Amino acid sequence: MKMFKQAILFAGILTAGALSAQSAQMNNMIKVGANVGLAVPSDNTSMAVGVDVAYQNLITPGFGLGIATGYTHYFGKENNGYDNNDVGVVPVGALIRIYPKQTGFYFGTDLGYGFLVGDDKVATNSTLDRPDGGFYIKPEIGYHNQSWNFFVQYQKVFVGSKGDLPNQDYNVGNIGAGFSYNIPLGK
């Protein structure tokens, strides 16, 4: 719970700073996108599909801050005799992006807290409770222009050893690819 409060405080500070520092040269946008990925490591899940929504404020032409959320669905799989349940991630975090040029290569990350949603148990044939969430990170690198972003990403919710079963680590993470469309909100 302490990490959750820190993540919310961090996101609030970044958002307040971005909103209070606006000038005529800043661009505001909503980013709406989708992604797909393969679970890594894949003890309890096989693949993931997700949607992303974010608000971004360009503090300078090459540096953006904002807030990000969305939903990623991880498909459970059978492993070591466990019939693992699907799990969803609802992240709440800060968005940080670096754009070296107006069009071309970019990189950045989302940092915050990932809420895990879905079945209460790790597996249908287990009594172990699913973790509620943990520290969330989503670094990405890709290509951008004024309207679109195309990227590869790593997405992970750190839950420690919560949800681990004998011979199986509980993991919520993937390596994938995605895109987002930028909806301009003005300067």
What are these model-predicted stretches?
Residues 21-59, 65, 174-176, 180-187:
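Short glycine/proline- and aromatic-enriched beta-strand/turn motifs that initiate or cap beta-hairpins
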Residues 36-40, 57, 69-75, 100-102, ...:
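Transmembrane beta-strands of outer-membrane beta-barrel pores
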Residues 30-36, 67-69, 94-96, 107-111, ...:
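Membrane-embedded beta-strand positions of outer-membrane beta-barrel proteins
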Residues 41-101:
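Glycine- and aromatic-enriched membrane insertion/assembly motifs of diderm outer-membrane
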Residues 1-27, 185-187:
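Cleavable N-terminal export/targeting peptides
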Residues 74-77, 135-187:
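Predominantly the C-terminal beta-signal and adjacent terminal strand-loop region
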Residues 42-49, 77-85, 117-131, 160-169:
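Outer-membrane beta-barrel translocator domains and adjoining extracellular loop/strand segments
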Residues 28-30, 45-49, 86-92, 131-137, ...:
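Residues that define the transmembrane beta-barrel architecture of outer-membrane proteins
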